[in-house]
Structure formats: structure tokens, C-alpha cells
Amino acid sequence: MSSCRYNGGVMRPLSNLSASRRNLHEMDSEAQPLQPPASVGGGGGASSPSAAAAAAAAVSSSAPEIVVSKPEHNNSNNLALYGTGGGGSTGGGGGGGGSGHGSSSGTKSSKKKNQNIGYKLGHRRALFEKRKRLSDYALIFGMFGIVVMVIETELSWGAYDKASLYSLALKCLISLSTIILLGLIIVYHAREIQLFMVDNGADDWRIAMTYERIFFICLEILVCAIHPIPGNYTFTWTARLAFSYAPSTTTADVDIILSIPMFLRLYLIARVMLLHSKLFTDASSRSIGALNKINFNTRFVMKTLMTICPGTVLLVFSISLWIIAAWTVRACERYHDQQDVTSNFLGAMWLISITFLSIGYGDMVPNTYCGKGVCLLTGIMGAGCTALVVAVVARKLELTKAEKHVHNFMMDTQLTKRVKNAAANVLRETWLIYKNTKLVKKIDHAKVRKHQRKFLQAIHQLRSVKMEQRKLNDQANTLVDLAKTQNIMYDMISDLNERSEDFEKRIVTLETKLETLIGSIHALPGLISQTIRQQQRDFIEAQMESYDKHVTYNAERSRSSSRRRRSSSTAPPTSSESS
């Protein structure tokens, strides 16, 4: 199973499969055998000879594959062997129809998978019903064989002997019911194996046949096959009498050895109870149990019954054990009980009852080891049933949660009143002592001692009532109070979680602001240097502009002065200068 892969009822090996071939197998695995990849593109003459040769080489080089498929309308397992040359027989033949088949294969495969899931669910439900019906029939035939065995044993002891035709007819009837029971058990386990295959997706029934399952099937068949066979067979039975210790030898029937183990068939009752239980048949309960990892077995059903109706279960079990053990002791002791003490059914019931209750008066003692073994098992069962009865009675006498809560509330109210009364008595006696010692002219010492005595009694009463109140508060920690405490703790934890989330948000905001501030601080030297450079550049530009203005002003001034000089040197002389 570890090296195979299950998909839609087909077990395929994972080795020697390429991705394209695996996809092809998954597309059409329910209705068709697996096809090699060379046949998918086989469109008449559309493919080239080189491609066909390469595909044929790929098919011939791949290892043979054994595919186990389960059709929807066939319960048998089909084996198909595909190897070299399989492409020609299964290849696509229709000219250019390969692309159309590839486009429609996806929807077909999805429909087939959905149909396969629905078929499996319906098949599983049918197997459940068949298994339940087989278990019912097996219980009917098993109980029928036990009843006929008891009738035959009683009639052969008092009415006729083992060699009569009546005994032979009844034994043949027991054998027939046993054969039918064995057939039903085999078919039941076959249904179990089919359910295992459906649940685990296996196609080979041999996968479910583990050594443990084989052992339990063989053990069940062996237990149910034991029955008194037709015919008269005897053996010599030697025992020692209880009170006289004298040996007793008699000829006994082999049927007594084969009849008593037939009561082991009663295990079928537990199986029927399991299969008819609402916890086992209800899908919702099984789903919840699977989520909680609970096994729905006979033990769980018995625990549920002991929780729901413990008294009824113990009563039915005790009475059934009492009757069966009494008849078994009677059957074991009838050959060596000469005084008809334990071989009498009422006497055997008395012996079983005093053994079951662990009393043991000693007035009746079994003679054979068979009777002693039955009494031993009865004593063990009685001890267990007594413990269960004590537990059930204690649980029935215990107060419920609501009753405990009401009782604690009433006791707390009464203790509160007693505390108030005791405190009032203390105050009253204190006032009376003060009055009789300070507010009177003549002190009455007897009255003062009386009030002092009452004062001390009131103090002790107040202390005892407060102690009872503390004990009640300690005992009041029931599941209801624990639930309240749990709710309070849940609210506190929720509040703390909300505060922690708010605190985390604030921390995240603070971290964001700190990161922004750190980024600004890291960018500050660059901004400062850039600002200083800009200011220096502006200052230098301003200085250069003022210098240029000064230079131009000086140049213009020198030009104007030179012009004046030139004009004065080139001007004609006036009349005053000439005279």
C-alpha cells in the first residue's frame, strides 16, 4: 500500500510513470483501461513516422503495469495487463478526433468521480444494513441453539435417555442452527472486510486480512462451533464429595462438556446492541466522535448505558448471570449429587446467590471442579457488581449541581443570620457589663460575672459561626463556581488581550514616528550642509554683484572724467583769454 496510489477505485504503482501518463490515467480510470500516451495523438495519418517511432519506443521501454479496476456494475476484481504493443490495440482510431476526446474527457472524468463517490456512499450504507441484519440473524440462531440445548439436556435427564430419537432430533436441530450460525458469522466478517475496503479505498480483500483479524475470526468460529453432537457418547467422571471427601466415580455424557460453552454465544448480544445503538448509527454522533478521537465500540456503548440507566443494566446483568450460573452448577453437579442438593435448580440458585453476594454460609458446597469454577467466576462477578451497585447508589444519593447551589445558598443565609445574632449578643453583653460597672452606684458582682460569662460565650459562638462560614465557602467551590471563576478569568484575559493589542498598536505607531524622526535626523546634516552651501553661494553671488557694480561705476566715472578732459583740451579760446 505504501508504494501504490489510489484514485477512483484503481491501484497503480507510482514508479515508471511520467507526469503525462499519470494525468492520462487519472482522466479516464473508471470505465476504460489505461492507455499509453502514443495512442492519444493517433489521428489517422496526422502524426509523422518519426513521432510514431518515438512513441512506440517509449511504450516498449516502459515496464508492464498491472491495474486493478473496479467497475460500477461488477463486484469482482478485474486484472488488466498492459505492456509492449499495447498502444496499437487501445490507440485512438478516428482520424482527427483526438483533440475532441481530450476536451470532453475532463467533464466526463469529473462526472464519473462524482458518480463513483455517490456509488461508494450508497454501497457503504447498504453494507451497514446488511451487517446489522446478519448480526440480528446470528443472535437469533445462537439463542435458538442455546434454548434447544437446555431443553434437550433437561428432557434427556428426566424424560428419556440420550439414545432416543427425540434426543437425536433435538441434537440435529442444534447442529443445523450451529451450521447456519457459522455461515452467518462468515458472511458477517465478509461484510466487515468489504466495509474496510470501501473505507480505505482498497480493491484487494487480502489487504484487510491481518493476523489479528484472522485470529479473532477463527476464535469466534471456534466458540460458536461448540455444541453437543448427535449421538450417545460417555466418559468416566471422578470427583471427591464435599463433606465426606469420599471419591465418586460415575459415567457422564460428553454433551455436558459441549453444552456449557454454548453460553459463550451470548457475546452476540453486545454486538447487536452496538450495531443498533443510536450513537453508532447516527452520522452526526459518529462525526463528532471522530473529531474527538472516540472509538464507537461495545465498551463505549456500555459506558453510555451505565451512565443513562445504571440500575436497569445492573439488574438485567445480575439476574441473567444468576440464572445461567445456577443452571450451569445444576448441570455440573447432577452426576455426583446423590442427595439432590446442588443438582436441584432452586438449591443451585441459593448457592449462586450466597456466592454472588460474597456471604458463603457453607451449607451448600459444589462437589466437582466444574461447579467450583462456576462459583469462582460468580464470586468475581458478584464483587464487581457489588462495587458498581455501591457506586451507582452513591451517585444517586449525591446532590445535583443545582441542589448543591441551593443548599449552599440556604446555609450561607443561615450562617449570616447567626453571625449577626452573635455580634449583637457581644454588643449587648458589652453594654450590660459597662452599665453594671460604670453607671450604677453599687456594683452587683454576681450580675457582672453573669454578663461576662455571656459575653465570652457570645465571642466563642461568633468565632465558631465564622469558622463554619469559612468551611462552607471552601466547600462551595463546585463546578458552578468554577464556571463563574472561569468566566471571570476569561473576561479578564480578554480585557488584558485588548489592552495588550492597544498597547502594541501604540508601540507600532511610536516606532513609526521614531523611524521617521531618525530618518529626519539622518537627513539633517545633509540639509544643513546644503543650506550652508546655498547661503555661501548666495553671499558670494551678492558680493560678486556688488563688486561688479562698483567696478562698472568706477569705469563709467573714469570714462566721464576723461571725456571732460578731452573736451576742455579741444575747446576754442574765448575773447577774454585772447585779450
Curated annotation (Swiss-Prot):
Q: In which tissues is it expressed?
A: Expressed in atrial myocytes (at protein level). Widely expressed.
Q: Where in the cell is it found?
A: Membrane; Cytoplasm, Myofibril, Sarcomere, Z line
User: Which Pfam family is one of those matched by this entry?
Assistant: SK_channel
Task: Give the Low complexity compositional bias ranges.
Answer: 568-579
Q: Where are the transmembrane segments?
A: 138-158, 168-188, 214-234, 256-276, 305-325, 374-394
GO cellular-component terms in the record? cell surface; dendritic spine; membrane; neuronal cell body; plasma membrane; Z disc
Feature: compositional bias, Gly residues: 90-103
Gene Ontology biological-process annotations = membrane repolarization during atrial cardiac muscle cell action potential; potassium ion transmembrane transport; potassium ion transport; regulation of potassium ion transmembrane transport
**Free-text domain note:** The coiled-coil domaim mediates heteromeic assembly. The calmodulin-binding domain (CaMBD) forms an elongated dimer with a calmodulin molecule bound at each end; each calmodulin wraps around three alpha-helices, two from one CaMBD subunit and one from the other.
Protein name stated in the entry:
Small conductance calcium-activated potassium channel protein 2
